[in-house]
Design a protein with these regions (language model features):
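Glycine-rich flexible loops
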Residues: 1-348
Length: 348
């Protein structure tokens, strides 16, 4: 059985909502984000490495037995981290692994849970004063029961942090340096609440000049670098304030996972492109201040999506905002993580 074959209007509605947020780069980028629905002791959750944008075209949901997974989380069973041992093999026609965030969805009691990487949310959630700003923005929304969650590594550590702040009424979780989780009884309820929360967090994007793509193309000619798939990516190098934000360090996990830590800046030697000498490997993404952005020819679709995401987020953060970036230790625990390596192999 597949989730696409289940005759249930809520399943259909979740697939439609998943696809809707999946094609909106301001809500979800690449293989990021995940959705779930709980039915008859089974939680159907987006499979690792799949794209929410494909929810209507492909079977992207994996069935997980809820009760044993919750017990494993409570007991400190290390199998809860990957959750592969709790997949219902008879229902899992796709054979895919569950999302890295399966434990997060499992500990939230609500039947429907949606986790997105909303750029307006992240632009607030990377700030040291973000929690107070978030609460102020959500004050007019009486139905929102908020939990502000400090940064933790995605997956089981994040699930434990959420569990410590979870009440029976909590339905919105703002995750520091990460994103947004919205929960509810029905897909329609979650969709409405998510839309209102994202609108409450709206921030205008700073304007930037257009990139001189002809000049950039001539600079990368004969090198291993290419222009980004989305021209909006160039903003992070063209807007000095956005570039200053990006230079601070890694703002959220998927940047590290798909692009590597921080932001490399290319050097021009007689008009020829050179990577910064301190980088042991060719960076997947490089900024040319005042000119634009280039990506390595090996960069995946996910990497291109995350490059655009960085531009979108940085352009929404005021230049004087107190920004928290991931520490070196937090970056290291995201790199060479087996679960993320698998996700990248599926999502290229």
């Amino acid at each position: 059985m597949t989730s696409a074959n289940i005759d249930d209007s809520e399943f259909r509605a979740l697939r439609e909502l998943s696809a809707e947020v999946g094609v909106d780069p301001l809500r979800t980028q690449g293989a990021g984000g995940n959705t779930s629905i709980k039915r008859d002791g089974v939680m159907w959750i987006k499979a690792s490495g799949t794209w929410l944008a494909d929810a209507l075209a492909h079977d992207i949901m994996t069935p997980v037995r809820l009760q044993p997974l919750r017990k494993a989380i409570a007991d400190g069973d290390p199998r809860a981290a990957a959750a592969v041992d709790f997949v219902d093999a008879q229902l899992n026609a796709s054979g895919l692994r569950p999302s890295i965030e399966t434990s997060v969805h499992a500990i939230i009691p609500s039947p429907v849970v949606v986790h997105i990487h909303c750029v307006n949310t992240i632009a607030l959630a990377v700030r040291y004063d973000g929690e107070s700003l978030v609460r102020e923005r959500l004050r007019p929304h009486a139905d929102v029961a908020l939990a502000s969650v400090p940064y933790r590594k995605p997956g089981l550590p994040l699930a434990h942090a959420i569990s410590e702040r979870l009440t029976k009424n909590t339905n919105v979780f703002v995750l520091a340096n990460h994103g947004l989780v919205v929960a509810g009884e029905t897909v329609a309820e979650v969709a409405d609440r998510m839309t209102r929360v994202c609108e409450a967090f709206f921030a205008p994007s700073r304007a930037a000049p257009q990139a001189d793509t002809e000049r950039l193309a001539s600079i990368v000619e004969g090198t291993d670098y290419r222009l980004p798939q989305d021209p909006a990516t160039h903003v992070v190098a063209l807007d000095p304030k956005s570039l200053a934000i990006a230079r601070l360090g890694s703002l959220y996990p998927d940047h590290v996972v798909f692009l590597g830590p921080g932001l490399a800046e290319a050097l021009l030697d007689g008009g020829r492109l050179r990577a910064p000498p301190e980088r042991r490997r060719p960076p997947l993404m490089m900024a040319l201040p005042g000119l634009g952005v280039v990506l390595h020819h090996s960069a995946s679709k996910n990497a291109h999506a995350m490059a655009r995401c960085l531009a979108d987020i940085a352009a929404r953060i005021p230049e004087d905002a107190p920004v928290r970036v991931l520490t070196s230790a937090e970056e290291q625990e995201l790199m060479n993580w087996e679960a993320e390596t698998y996700r990248q192999s599926i999502g290229r």
